[in-house]
């Protein structure tokens, strides 16, 4: 896989499950990051013929930075190894996921060629869906666009994972900087008049040309979101880093499905050591509809490495960076501003 792939299936329970297939090769990590921003669980694939790879490690760390809490590990190509090598692959995976959210995840060996293990995998996917927190409806829909194209006879189409609220046909929306109207909606290959959060959806739009939109844009309802070009956030610096995190560097933040060159200021100190937690202020090149609790991954493009990631704490910081000590408490927001908004308590 070079770019994102999309698929869906109906599980034995009748639950409908959507997949975002992300590329594994290091050269396409930016595409991987564009795809994982909207996921709630992971099907973590390791080829039994190859075992754990350096990119497996980076993908696992990225999923942890994004707050993913549940998943299933799948050992593919199991028909190409004997029983001893398959057992070694199991042990290899168990060693690497120890201490992570996948530590207690089921490991299923499968073969796409023979069909071995696929029924077991479908049962485990049902169990995964059952233990994964359902998307909540806050009445504020947001869809980070991961694909834009023009459909013959229909016009502009954007796709993404819907969160936060519902979309309906004929609804007015804002995508990036452009106002538009929803002509039609599709999910899992069928047309619908309304769609709820936690769903992969294709949105056919009128009033905007597909050339004016791009991956990383957000589709939202008008006048529901505060756009911000700076925010304070918690950050965890990866332990594997061989240097401290400072304000110096060519940083890129991956938020939703977007990739944004950012400036960074470490809060409360000058540096953060590998394996530690702290706070940062990030300055974006363009304003985005963010809210506290949104997750991000931080990379340093000069070194071509993942630095860490964290959670948005304050979408409208009022204190100078030298004085800021952000957290998600209402007390802190009221103390600094004297007021609080609905977005601050979500």
Question: Locations of the language-model features?
Answer:
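Helix-rich terminal scaffold detector
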Residues: 1-3, 11-18, 38-46, 72, ...
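Solvent-exposed alpha-helical segments within well-ordered globular domains of core cellular machineries
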Residues: 30, 34, 44, 54-61, ...
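Conserved Switch II/interswitch segment of TRAFAC-class P-loop GTPases
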Residues: 16, 22-28, 36-88
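C-terminal effector modules of nucleic-acid-centric enzymes and ribosome-associated factors
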Residues: 81-85, 95, 107, 208-346
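Conserved catalytic-core segments of large NTP-driven translation/proteostasis enzymes
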Residues: 78, 95-241
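Conserved nucleotide-binding/hydrolysis micro-motifs of P-loop NTPases
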Residues: 25-26, 49-53, 68, 77-82, ...
């Amino acid at each position: 896989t070079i770019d994102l792939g999309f698929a869906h299936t109906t599980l034995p329970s009748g639950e409908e499950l959507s997949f975002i297939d992300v590329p594994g090769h290091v050269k396409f990590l930016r595409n991987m990051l564009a795809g994982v921003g909207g996921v709630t669980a992971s099907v973590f694939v390791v080829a039994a013929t190859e075992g754990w790879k350096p990119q497996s490690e980076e993908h696992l760390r990225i999923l942890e930075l994004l707050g993913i809490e549940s998943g299933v590990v799948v050992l593919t190509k199991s028909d190409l190894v004997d029983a001893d090598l398959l057992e070694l692959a199991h042990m290899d995976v168990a060693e690497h996921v120890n201490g992570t959210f996948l530590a207690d995840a089921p490991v299923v060996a499968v073969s796409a060629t023979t069909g071995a293990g696929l029924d077991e995998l479908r049962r485990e996917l049902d169990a995964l869906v059952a233990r994964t927190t359902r998307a909540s409806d806050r009445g504020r829909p947001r869809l980070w666009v991961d694909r834009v194209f023009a459909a013959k006879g229909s016009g502009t189409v954007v796709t993404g994972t819907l969160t936060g609220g519902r979309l309906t046909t004929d609804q007015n929306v804002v995508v990036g900087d452009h106002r538009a109207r929803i002509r039609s909606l599709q999910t899992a290959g069928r047309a619908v008049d309304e769609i709820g959060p936690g769903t992969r959806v294709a949105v056919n739009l009128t009033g905007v040309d597909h050339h004016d939109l791009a991956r990383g844009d957000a589709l939202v309802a008008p006048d529901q979101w505060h756009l911000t070009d700076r925010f304070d956030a918690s950050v965890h610096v990866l332990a594997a880093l061989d240097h401290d995190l400072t304000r110096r560097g060519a940083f890129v933040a991956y938020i939703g499905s977007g990739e944004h060159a950012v400036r960074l200021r470490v809060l409360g100190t000058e540096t953060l050591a590998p394996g530690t937690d702290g706070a940062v202020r990030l300055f974006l090149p363009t304003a985005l509809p963010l809210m506290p609790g949104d997750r991000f991954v931080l990379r340093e493009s000069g070194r071509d490495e993942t630095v860490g990631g964290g959670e948005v704490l304050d979408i409208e910081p009022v204190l100078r960076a030298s004085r800021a000590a952000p957290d998600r408490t209402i007390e802190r927001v009221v103390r600094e501003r004297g007021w609080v908004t609905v977005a601050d308590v979500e």
